[in-house]
């Protein structure tokens, strides 16, 4: 059995330095020392989330090829950073780059920040040649079609480290998705289009394994939950949440809370034993379950599991990726759904929620644990956590299957405080203003065919999803403060042509 984690501690990124034997041993020793110093600065920086491992200077084609193959074979290695300290003839890199299957970042930097004007001689010029050595390297990457992120500047600069750290988080998300198994309990909500998708293509494209289990396989685990396991969870609920009086010990509906805890015990047992990192449920396919899972889903998402409602495995994958990519950062990531609008001119905003399953990592407050009727599903009233999402910057991201490819759409948003309390709304919720404005955002979202289920992340911004999509060679459309509907519509049309051509090539 394996416990879920979002930690990046078991991952590493290799730091590669290119040169050639032409320079001689003394210069190559300087190259090694200075590249180790660059790697050390990255490794010790608090804003670099993944361990950086320096590798010996690469000087010939065979060593480069072997390094790429070693990286491919290492489960710990989630990507490579390369820098051409001197001039490294790029034909030496062809076999290695062609074989490489890991995310790649080209760091265009140099050892020194300022030029030592009064002492510069030809020895200095020969040693510090990244300004044109990296141009040679950039050419061969483009010639080979290598997908990479290019970062320019000295590693002592915060913006440079931020870009590298963001790419590392995207690479970690990519690694997590590649080892991800998704358990679907039942199938999609009947007749819904956007939650469907090609699971075989997803395994080829993203590495994720998506399969279905009968809901009653889960029911067996729920029914097997012991009183001791349930008691332990109820104790935890009492520590963490404000429990409604009727659900408290001795309350008239306390048994409903205990059954909610049994669902959590059973779900966690099933997921851990199967090595799953994400799951879906459907209110139309509940088998012997007495409640639609709500509280259990919320708490498992908070631990790092991906989740999709109504069989939506694509959103479950995105949420798991977002959880890993946001590891260690304040905020959270959750299933979200655009529900209804506030359309007062000048005040336009969106009220988002779901039936039950919003992750409590979106709040720093103390959620209330409540029970209310649910008009669909035909089961007992489910227990759930109720709270308001913390105000602040966020991004909402969706994935759609566009037949010949997957499309990711991201909207930059600002979560805002509620205008008034919502005493009669019995679910967790968020209110946000989308960029650039609601009308443009919604029209662009509809134009893109983006899904109604999203992941909302308050931990990471849109750049990490841009890097993730680039690594995955997957279409990404961004709606932000610079978006115009006219320009966005053109981009959608251009993308259709580009991605179809790219697949053919």
UniProtKB/Swiss-Prot annotation:
For activity, the cofactor(s) needed are: Mn(2+)
Which note does the record give on the cofactor?
A: Binds 1 Mn(2+) ion per subunit.
EC numbers listed for it are 5.3.1.4
Instruction: List the GO terms this entry assigns under cellular component, sorted alphabetically.
Output: cytosol
Q: Which UniProt keywords apply?
A: Arabinose catabolism, Carbohydrate metabolism, Isomerase, Manganese, Metal-binding
The protein's annotated catalytic reaction(s) are: beta-L-arabinopyranose = L-ribulose
Q: What pathway annotation does it carry?
A: Carbohydrate degradation; L-arabinose degradation via L-ribulose; D-xylulose 5-phosphate from L-arabinose (bacterial route): step 1/3
**NCBIfam families in the cross-refs:** PRK02929.1 (NF002795)
Q: Which family does it belong to?
A: Belongs to the arabinose isomerase family.
This protein's name:
L-arabinose isomerase
Q: What species is this protein from?
A: Clavibacter sepedonicus (Clavibacter michiganensis subsp. sepedonicus)
